[in-house]
From Swiss-Prot:
Originating gene: rplN
Record's keyword terms, sorted: Ribonucleoprotein, Ribosomal protein, RNA-binding, rRNA-binding
Protein name: Large ribosomal subunit protein uL14
Subunit structure: Part of the 50S ribosomal subunit. Forms a cluster with proteins L3 and L19. In the 70S ribosome, L14 and L19 interact and together make contacts with the 16S rRNA in bridges B5 and B8.
Gene3D superfamilies per the UniProt record, alphabetical: Ribosomal protein L14
GO BP field: translation
Lineage: Bacteria, Pseudomonadati, Pseudomonadota, Alphaproteobacteria, Hyphomicrobiales
HAMAP family: Ribosomal_uL14
Single GO MF annotation: structural constituent of ribosome
Described purpose of this protein according to its UniProt entry: Binds to 23S rRNA. Forms part of two intersubunit bridges in the 70S ribosome.
CDD domains: Ribosomal_uL14
Similarity comment: family membership: Belongs to the universal ribosomal protein uL14 family.
Any Gene Ontology CC annotation: cytosolic large ribosomal subunit
Pfam hit, one: Ribosomal_L14
Natural source organism: Methylobacterium radiotolerans (strain ATCC 27329 / DSM 1819 / JCM 2831 / NBRC 15690 / NCIMB 10815 / 0-1)
């Protein structure tokens, strides 16, 4: 469950290391984002020669949350930390690699490029 002011790790090689959610997209009064939702983030920490720099405002897809994700079969999946992947306006990832596992709920949200780049889909 991601809301405004939440800090997230970045799970790609775009150059950002840590971002902060500044808006949850998808409705004027929407408060929370879960796995697969698009949010607007501000880059808080970045590596020196990355594609993005500190202070950039980007869109991102939430790929891991510490809050449980309930599945139709009754099972739940949760991660240790919140993480996101930075995307452009065409909803394609900015980085060329994805780090760590991603849940298969991203497939239902049409984030196929992230699924294909991920080393493991849970």
């Amino acid at each position: 469950m991601i809301q405004m002011q939440t800090n997230l790790d970045v799970a790609d090689n775009s150059g950002a290391r840590r971002v902060m959610c500044i808006k949850v997209l998808g409705g004027s009064k929407r408060k929370y984002a879960g796995v697969g939702d698009v949010i607007v983030v501000s880059v808080k920490e970045a590596i020196p020669r990355g594609r993005v720099k500190k202070g950039d405002v980007m869109k991102a897809v939430v790929v891991r949350t510490a809050k449980d994700v309930k599945r139709a079969d009754g099972s739940v999946i949760r991660f240790d930390k919140n993480a996101a992947v930075l995307i452009n306006n065409q909803k394609e990832p900015i980085g060329t690699r994805i780090f760590g596992p991603v849940p298969r709920e991203l497939r239902a949200r049409n984030h196929m490029k992230i699924i294909s780049l991920a080393p493991e889909v849970l």
